[in-house]
Amino acid sequence: MNRNPDQNTFPNITLKIIETYLGRVPSVNEYHMLKLQARNIQKITVFNKDIFVSLVKKNKKRFFSDVDTSASEIKDRILSYFSKQTQTYNIGKLFTIIELQSVLVTTYTDILGVLTIKAPNVISSKISYNVTSMEELARDMLNSMNVAVIDKAKVMGRHNVSSLVKNVNKLMEEYLRRHNKSCICYGSYSLYLINPNIRYGDIDILQTNSRTFLIDLAFLIKFITGNNIILSKIPYLRNYMVIKDENDNHIIDSFNIRQDTMNVVPKIFIDNIYIVDPTFQLLNMIKMFSQIDRLEDLSKDPEKFNARMATMLEYVRYTHGIVFDGKRNNMPMKCIIDENNRIVTVTTKDYFSFKKCLVYLDENVLSSDILDLNADTSCDFESVTNSVYLIHDNIMYTYFSNTILLSDKGKVHEISARGLCAHILLYQMLTSGEYKQCLSDLLNSMMNRDKIPIYSHTERDKKPGRHGFINIEKDIIVF
């Protein structure tokens, strides 16, 4: 029986808090389910909605000035959401509303509201790089890797981009400056800061509070546009979330990492923004070329990759004094694949203190083998490398999430061999190990190469799990 509680049954204060929030006397079930949320509910109830409305209006004026919506519409949307619980009787939906409202009242001001106040002066820290001098070299390197055969019958998933991306980019530029201890960028925009000729779409970010930030941003967009905004979590991408609009158009995505991971990511400071060190990004690019899909992207738009590659090559030339003379020494390191067990053995003794690296293509198998080794010193760098690393008895153990290209039966293609070497070098950079000689040899091994056709490739590791999402309009959280 769903009776209304009377004030003699429950503590007056808790009952009053819930009653004020719901705008009605709670049922017995509502009271018992919501009483542990009383503290959060009280914060929501006393939250100054007028100040919040003012902050959203200021965000709109600064970053979304071209969006056709009035101040009164924004206010109505905000007040409507903060009274939504009064018309909601489903306990699950009430919990969702409380959780999302709690995020807004406790974090919005510090995360997005702060972007409306006067910013610190920008510390100009740009260096003039001669990217043009690297364009021919980059083109030569990429041309030798442009070996993917495009299957015209293959149906490619479309990546629809929202018209709001330019507004969000403008906001993100300021956000990266204000929150540069917890948020850094990589990808095309970060390279654009070095070379203004780089074209970029959305801004790629790593941060330590991704979920909170994306919820706040989703609500800002909802209050300004009136659109239903959905946050999605993809199971095969670690700690990844994306914001899309109601038409499935991509707005922004983000990877979340721990603070201890953030602390070790190599980064440089440009115009008050931290970007992932382009040396690290170059290694990641070389690693990603082992992925057959990335080679297909290269085939479709080689000039886009050329601009990025030339920028990063010039950066490493200038920063590390790399001489491009074709001297490759022992690069790429020897790689032998066991296709049945899906493990690649890389001979590393010429460069590192560990004699070899066992690269697993199945993450669960690696995890099981590490347990069998009874070793507890593995390093997990989350989405920064998509892998753990362990050095035990002079052997490195790690996981490689991309495909392995083969140039012949049982023979690792040199593109993948370089990708595996780059994967090991990422570890060296993250742990402040020696990498510069190896980096020089690796880059020189990419010069003056002939195209080698792809014979076949291994399949990527299948990741279990389900898609998660937050649907603001329908008051649903599934994770």
Curated annotation (Swiss-Prot):
Family the entry assigns: Belongs to the poxviridae poly(A) polymerase catalytic subunit family.
Protein name according to UniProt: Poly(A) polymerase catalytic subunit
E.C. designation(s): 2.7.7.19
Keywords: ATP-binding, Calcium, Early protein, Metal-binding, mRNA processing, Nucleotide-binding, Transcription, Transferase
Record has Transferase as a keyword: yes
Gene that this sequence comes from: OPG063
Substrates-to-products reaction catalysed: RNA(n) + ATP = RNA(n)-3'-adenine ribonucleotide + diphosphate
GO biological process terms on file: mRNA processing
Positions that bind Ca(2+) 2: D202, D204, D253
Enzyme class name: transferase
Cross-referenced InterPro entries: PolyA_pol_cat_Poxvir (IPR004976), PolyA_pol_cat_sf (IPR037265), PolyA_pol_nucTrfase_Poxvir (IPR024231), PolyA_pol_nucTrfase_sf_Poxvir (IPR038419), Poxvirus_polyA_pol_cat_C (IPR024397), Poxvirus_polyA_pol_cat_N (IPR024398), Poxvirus_polyA_pol_cat_N_sf (IPR038337)
Catalytic residues, chain numbering: D202, D204
Subunit structure as annotated in this protein's UniProt entry: Heterodimer of a large (catalytic) subunit and a small (regulatory) subunit.
Keyword ATP-binding: yes
Molecular function GO labels: ATP binding; metal ion binding; poly(A) RNA polymerase activity
Function in brief: Polymerase that creates the 3'-poly(A) tail of mRNA's.
Pfam families listed in its UniProt record: Pox_polyA_pol, Pox_polyA_pol_C, Pox_polyA_pol_N
Binding positions for Ca(2+) 1 per the UniProt entry: D202, D204
Induction annotation: Expressed in the early phase of the viral replicative cycle.
Organism expressing this protein natively: Vaccinia virus (strain Ankara) (VACV)
